[in-house]
Curated annotation (Swiss-Prot):
It comes from the Bacteria. It comes from Syntrophotalea carbinolica (strain DSM 2380 / NBRC 103641 / GraBd1). Its cofactor is FAD. GO terms for molecular function: flavin adenine dinucleotide binding. Pfam families: GIDA, GIDA_C_1st, SAM_GIDA_C. This is tRNA uridine 5-carboxymethylaminomethyl modification enzyme MnmG.
Amino acid sequence: MAEYGKDYEVIVVGAGHAGCEAALASARMGCNTLLLNLHLDAVAQMSCNPAIGGLAKGHLVREIDALGGEMARVIDATGIQFRTLNTKKGPAVRATRAQADRRAYQFHMKQVVENQPALDLKQGSVSRLILQGDKVSGVETTDGLRFFGQTVVLTTGTFMRGLIHVGLQHFPGGRAGEPPSLGLSDHLAELGLRVGRLKTGTPARLDGNTIDYDRLVPQHGDVPPKPFSADTEKITSPQVPCFITATNAHTHDIIRQGLDRSPLYQGVIEGVGPRYCPSIEDKIMRFPDKDSHHVFLEPEGLGTREVYPNGVSTSLPPDVQLAFLRTIPGLEHVEIMRPGYAIEYDFVDPIQLKPSLETKKIRNLFLAGQINGTSGYEEAAAQGLMAGINAVHALRDCPPVVLGRDQAYIGVMIDDLVTCGTSEPYRMFTSRAEYRLLLREDNADQRLTPLGHQVGLVSDERWQRFTRKMDKIVEGRDFLEKRRLSSSDKEAIGRLGLEDLKNGLSLVQILRRPDINIEDLVFCDDRLADIPENVREQLQIEIKYEGYIARQYEMVERFRRSEQIAIPSDMDYSPIEGLSIEVREKLQKVRPQNLGQAARIPGVTPAAVAILSVLLRRN
């Protein structure tokens, strides 16, 4: 083994979405950082769909941005369609989704990484960790190099013992055309970490020149497109439509006939697949009464003919893929440019992590992304950002940054992982959050930018813009409370459909009415037009939903009280009377840090929590 002549403070293994955020956070916080990837042409690669955001995922992207992460800025620079989803529903579940130019996104993120001071990007495959006692001190690569670092972040994606399946053929790979990472997961298991097996998949890529777009329904983006990042003034990339079609009974018949050559249905694949992003084979078999499934045709970029058919992920043989695709309207003469495939890979049971994403067994070793059992670029990037921040805090002996369930979707996700673990690829949903009315996209900066500035990831310039926005919210609320309409404002009363106002009403009182929005009030007083649109939107939400918001804050206060009751890390649960054997085993396995976390462990009953509460308060 040859030692590399330079020591690092933070080493990040894997330059996908988690690894890029972890390495950038570490370097921007002033630490000498190394980012290693199997292949430098695959930095920030979008392995599956060419899109960022979506339901709950858009919230994660806004939170990453509010903390000072990079993903939002890169998609704003390279996005080719932006849409707000759930516009007819409440503000808690509205979300932004952007189609990406896949190559442009990858190239842009790599440029950001390469231009970041204190960050070295190198090619290499890590096979082992270097340990000093119970503490990590570096990594070894398959080509015989040893890199030393005070903290290590593993963000290996789907590469650990990756195995690709196309029909009944299978071969090692971490992604199509790229080798897997061999040796590392076996090494982690040797060190005592529990390693499991998961599966995911991707559809074929289609030749756009062989698609009959006249038979498809176009789906256009918002005009004007709304950026993800607070740093982006406006989207400047050309915008393009997606197209919608659907499978039919003939499609489903061909798929059923091909199941004897499906690795999924012939017992070849052992890993558990994603429940909420099933393959088209799974959809047909799990929902036999459904005679059609939507297919969204998404362009892979402005400079390519490749099209991503969202909704038909598959590992069937290429000839079956082509046959079923050609039964779909608009795809009768389609050609496949790359076949779809399934991939199995190793992951580490996230119950073995602290809320900081540091492993409980090995000090200064952090895990983020799909290695923790999650799926999705956004989930990975969010974990990478937090792991990067906490890796720096660990080597500086600072307390870890742990976001609460009431503070961020990132906090909900990490708490779910380290408290409950996962046996299938974990995906973020708004329904996973108890306090989702407090965790909206529009107030992500309000919730997290102060923390981002505190840890050193939000610039002073951006902090000043944020404080100016907060001042405008206060001023806007004050104006709406003081400005009143009276019976003399006959034109305004008539246009708003109000009855004669004897005692007058403030604009806040009027805005609380369900049929009136803040734009309706602009003609009442043109000073409202001077308030920025994003501030007006936030004022409207906070005023219209303030009763519900107040109730959620009351719930949060009760929740926080239980979170403040700490549980010693070395607590022995075996002698505690009243706890069942099952509860003791679960508490011993998870080792919750506080009473609130203990209460969220599946199988830990309210009675058991009450016993723990009495014991902890007594001691």
